[in-house]
Each structure stands twice: as structure tokens, then as C-alpha cells.
Amino acid sequence: MVEPIFRVVDLRVTRGRSSIYDHRSEGSGKLVHIHFCASCGTKLYMTFERFEASCGVYAGTFDDPNWLQIGGGNAKHIFIEAARHETILPPGIPTFLQHAMTNDGTPQEPVIFEKPRVVGKGRTG
């Protein structure tokens, strides 16, 4: 899931209406509000109790999901300890085992790989 982050004031839904599902983050204990299409159920974007001025837009909702160039200056991979089996992390992007900051706002030190790195726990059964 690629999730560009924008300011809430810059987001506009231009058609239809969304419904909201609230999910409590296991990491912060704060609510994550999942906004989805009321007609078809497609996830559109997220807003956050923890970061009230920000929203994360699901890349698959853009007409052209490749419009945003992703690199070390504008991207990060978080919660890589819970990554899907055989997830490939590209080089040069800051990565974090969990969130990029602690619950009190203290920034965490990223790990930046020089080569592509395969992560994720193997499946059993």
C-alpha cells in the first residue's frame, strides 16, 4: 500500500460520499478513520486522531497511481516488522520497524538499506 500523506485541508472528494470505519491503532492506541466509498466499499483515504491535520490517500484511488515520484526525500516504510512475507524494500528509503516516532513524538532513527532488502515473516501451515 502506497499512501501519500496530504494536509486534510487540501483533500476534496469530488464525487459520491464516503462512509467511515474507525480502527484503533495497536501502536499508538489512537483512532485511525478509514474513509471508504459508501456504494462499493473501496478504501479512499485515512484520517488520524493522532495527526489531525493529515490524511493518507490510498494510491489505487488516483487516476494515475504513478504520478507521485517516490524516493528517500519524500517516503518512508513503517511497521516493517509486520511486513507481508517476501516484501521487497527498495534501497535509499528510510525504514522503521514500527512507527517513525514514539507515542510522545520522539523521532525514531531510520534504517536505510543500500541494496533491495526482502523482509516479512514466513508463513506456516
Describe each region flagged by the PLM.
Residues M1-G125:
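A short Gly-Trp-Pro
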